[in-house]
């Protein structure tokens, strides 16, 4: 009988055991990818998986983390949780080769996902827009973003914003994302549908006269279709991707409110009678309705004395600014929910009453417009749905930038971009973790940065020959920004001196640490004023590092319990006693 031999057992490859750091990194990578995927899919883009698929374009081989497309708009995504600038430069070089070999790229993604993306399509190769987005877990510095202007940087706050927007208004969030990408209506879809200028025409119901508004602001009432507003409207949300440039004042869209309005629209079969308040774009014109096919334009000042007037508004993406009524407009959003079929029947037929504000561009620059609008927004909203303290402070900062509150708000936002408070302040409801700011601004910063040479303020000790010009009504904006930066740098050096003594507990995730609480920060700001009084000058990091070595306070949960939420005077007195002697 032949002897049987047992085949040798295959060696089972042991699964690599990940360290805690590796597990944490993997978890963060998965979270970033899931958020990006969720945004694009919720807003109506198709996804093509390219991760792990190497492809050479020109002379450069490389990989892409993902490709998303809508019609002729293709977004190439790079996902990273690191901050390797050389890695970014390599990726940008690779993207440039993709653009140079566009048709080859389109054929490649068609081969990867033929069921989603067939090529050739109804669009010519030239009609496709290829846009490179760098999605990072951490903020990219200004130097880097300026070095690569062709890249759209999808930082953590911007991604959170668009994800929130997409979850609230689904496909209608695309319009704002297109603006972020630098695209307009004419760039999207078939070129034949975008060669001629489009307009929104409507009969003027009431040309408002005697409104009491300042000269150069004109008011007119008319109707618009919900679809037209969805296509052309934008909102100056404080927490949006554009908020870094300032002058934005509105709240985030509220998903629960949108859902309630959407249910009402679907069940009631009627529109709202409350007016949507908007700003109208440049290029808006007025003509008299009649037999003349080419009627002459009417000056807006003459509207109140003329009947049968038509308003003509350019049909442009993100051109009509909503001051009040964003939820009533976006309740009509495009989306794949169970109400979409009913809403879609009325979106292009249902008219909304609109009150439009038209500015004289010779008298109103953009910052002046936002100041007027933010005041109007507060007037219309604060009584019916109380504005939160942080947004209220922010709006006051816009309205009165040279007030102590206005300066304090701008200083705090500047400090949030610097160590030791970089990205630690809670400036947006999109942030779940952070240091709350209203108390810090009101009780800590406001008095310290005031434009006063009589009080113990940073302004008093600011060495600048031109500083008194800030007290004039016609002040120099660059001088104002110089003072904001001086305050932020000086206070950052002060708190960096403090951090050098408490670096082990300078961490928001440390549940036993109380050094990054509003109470502690207000106390240290009040003590900074005491240091100004004693030393009669603004000191630097090394000075404060040396002084804080004397501090014996332990900012632990138990030790800090004696200093309640508003007991900063006691804490400030102890800091004064131990440090400024």
What are these regions (language model features)?
Residues 1-60, 69-70, 107-113:
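Acidic-basic catalytic patches of nuclease active cores, encompassing PD-(D/E)XK
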Residues 3-13, 58-61, 71-75, 80-581:
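Accessory terminal alpha-helical modules
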């Amino acid at each position: 009988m032949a002897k049987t031999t047992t085949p040798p057992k295959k060696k089972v490859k042991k699964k690599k055991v990940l360290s805690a750091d590796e597990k944490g990194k993997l978890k963060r990578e998965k979270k970033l990818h899931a958020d990006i995927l969720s945004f694009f899919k919720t807003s109506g883009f198709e996804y093509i998986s390219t991760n792990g698929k190497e492809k050479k374009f020109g002379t450069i081989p490389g990989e892409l983390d993902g490709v998303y497309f809508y019609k002729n708009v293709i977004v190439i995504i790079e996902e990273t949780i690191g901050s390797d600038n050389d890695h970014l430069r390599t990726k940008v070089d690779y993207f440039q080769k993709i653009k140079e070999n566009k048709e080859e790229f389109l054929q490649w993604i068609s081969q990867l996902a033929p069921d989603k993306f067939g090529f050739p399509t109804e669009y010519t190769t030239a009609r496709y827009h290829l846009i490179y987005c760098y999605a990072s877990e951490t903020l990219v510095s200004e130097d880097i973003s300026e070095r690569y202007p062709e890249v759209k940087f999808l930082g953590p706050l911007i991604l959170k914003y668009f994800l929130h927007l997409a979850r609230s208004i689904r496909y209608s969030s695309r319009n704002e994302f297109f603006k972020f990408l630098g695209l307009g209506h004419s760039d999207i879809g078939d070129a034949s549908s975008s060669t001629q200028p489009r307009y929104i025409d409507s009969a003027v119901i009431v040309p408002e006269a005697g409104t009491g508004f300042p000269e150069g602001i004109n008011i007119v009432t008319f109707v618009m279709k919900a679809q037209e507003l969805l296509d052309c409207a934008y909102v100056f949300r404080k927490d949006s991707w554009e908020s870094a440039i300032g002058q934005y004042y509105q709240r985030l869209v509220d998903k629960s409110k949108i859902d309630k309005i959407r249910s009402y629209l679907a069940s009631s079969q009627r529109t709202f009678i409350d007016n949507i308040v908007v700003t109208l774009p440049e290029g808006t014109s007025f003509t008299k309705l009649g037999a003349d096919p080419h009627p002459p334009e009417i000056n807006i000042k003459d509207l109140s004395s003329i009947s049968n007037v038509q308003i003509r508004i350019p049909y442009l993406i993100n051109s009509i600014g909503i001051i009040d009524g964003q939820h009533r407009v976006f309740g009509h959003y495009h989306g794949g929910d169970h109400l979409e079929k009913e809403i879609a029947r009325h979106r292009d037929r249902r008219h909304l009453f609109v009150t439009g504000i038209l500015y004289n561009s010779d008298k109103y620059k953009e910052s002046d417009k936002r100041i007027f609008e933010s005041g109007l927004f507060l007037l219309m909203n604060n009584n019916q749905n109380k504005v939160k303290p942080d947004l209220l402070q922010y709006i006051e900062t816009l309205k009165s930038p040279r007030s102590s509150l206005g300066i304090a708000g701008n200083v705090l936002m500047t400090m949030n971009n610097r160590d030791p408070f970089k990205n630690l302040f809670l400036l947006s409801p999109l942030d779940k973790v952070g240091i709350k700011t209203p108390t810090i601004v009101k009780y800590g910063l406001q008095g310290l940065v005031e434009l006063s040479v009589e009080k113990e303020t940073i302004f008093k000790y600011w060495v600048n020959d031109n500083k008194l010009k800030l007290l004039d009504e016609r002040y120099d904006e660059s001088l104002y920004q110089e003072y904001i930066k001086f305050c932020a740098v000086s206070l950052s050096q002060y708190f960096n001196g403090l951090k050098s003594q408490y670096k082990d507990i300078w961490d928001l995730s440390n549940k036993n640490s109380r050094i990054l609480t509003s109470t502690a920060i207000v106390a240290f700001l009040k003590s900074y004023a005491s240091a100004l009084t004693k030393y009669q000058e603004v000191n630097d990091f090394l000075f404060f590092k040396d002084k804080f070595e004397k501090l014996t306070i332990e900012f632990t949960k138990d030790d800090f319990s004696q200093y309640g939420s508003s007991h900063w005077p006691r804490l400030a007195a102890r800091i004064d006693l131990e440090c400024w002697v």
